[in-house]
């Protein structure tokens, strides 16, 4: 099999104008692979370490030259000669070279860039699309696009607490139809906001970011847009939230809608929302280390709605194993840069699926034109993907890749649709 011949890296810009790492891997048969690393705005405390330069004279301290040099001077020479298809061995070699628990020496952004670029090179050498190379012949499930069409929290300069208000086209017959429905609702929402004199500026992930009176108002506006676009809420298009509660948790309580609330009060609030709206999924409803609170909310709402651990699990198999053991959450958000390698990402997905947890493949708020997560969503048959609004090219690139994959699969393609959310009774 082809072996690694050269590894190069460079500093490029992400969708927020901040530097990130791009890596290219060349094999001795001429095959190449390239990958760019995303970056988050609301980051979990337990994520792998993203290496930044800290030099205020370059990119306000956010440069990634240290990570680039780590690839060129340390990782690359170590990996030359490795069989490119031995992904687990290659990733382990980088872990050993880094020799920390959180990838803080070489940087998760350096390690992940190489890890993904190797997979791209190996898939090219194997003459297979990435989703097929990683997922094998059973990779066939197209995910429900969880479109973040209204932004708040850390993703927008607005007074809305909840970070993401999403639509999920669960009633569509195909991914391409789901994408069309979502785009139509997105454009209709813009018209609804304009007619009410509300701002239509965009947040980091392409959703609108108006100042609203409450989080419920955001949900009501989206329901209005769904209906005005000609669709039935709950039957054709459902709603989903990313609360990102760790962002407004301080000193044991949640500063939410002008009040300090306990975990029990937040749980009651979510229970009211689940009764009032066609919600299929709530991500990070509580603080990332409030295991007791997560256990309580899962016991109360876990049979009615998907409860997704993002900051809670940070795509880390060890934290996920604790969540499974303690019945905390019932779904995993999958972000490759939280854990920092392809191998560990796939291990987390496998552990989740083996234990009855749903998985949602996810972008970050700081993205690039890299489309790897689209292939990963299909390779793992996870049935859900979160990659922003149907706007801004770094978001749309992933949706367009899924359209291509659907075309490649042809009659073998299955759209996850409503089956992705078995707990939803709406």
Curated annotation (Swiss-Prot):
Q: Which residues form the active site?
A: 205, 335
Taxonomic classification: Bacteria, Bacillati, Actinomycetota, Actinomycetes, Kitasatosporales
Co-factor remark: Binds a second Mg(2+) ion via substrate during catalysis.
Gene Ontology process terms (BP)? glycolytic process
Q: Where in the cell is it found?
A: Cytoplasm; Secreted; Cell surface
Q: Which SUPFAM superfamilies match?
A: Enolase C-terminal domain-like, Enolase N-terminal domain-like
Please list the residues that bind Mg(2+).
Answer: 242, 283, 310
User: Pathway it acts in?
Assistant: Carbohydrate degradation; glycolysis; pyruvate from D-glyceraldehyde 3-phosphate: step 4/5
Q: What Pfam family is a match for this entry?
A: Enolase_C
Q: Which GO terms describe its molecular function?
A: magnesium ion binding; phosphopyruvate hydratase activity
Origin species, per record, is Streptomyces coelicolor (strain ATCC BAA-471 / A3(2) / M145)
Keywords of the record: Cytoplasm, Glycolysis, Lyase, Magnesium, Metal-binding, Secreted
Cofactor(s), by name: Mg(2+)
Any idea what this protein is called? Enolase 1
Provide the binding site for (2R)-2-phosphoglycerate.
163, 335, 364-365, 386
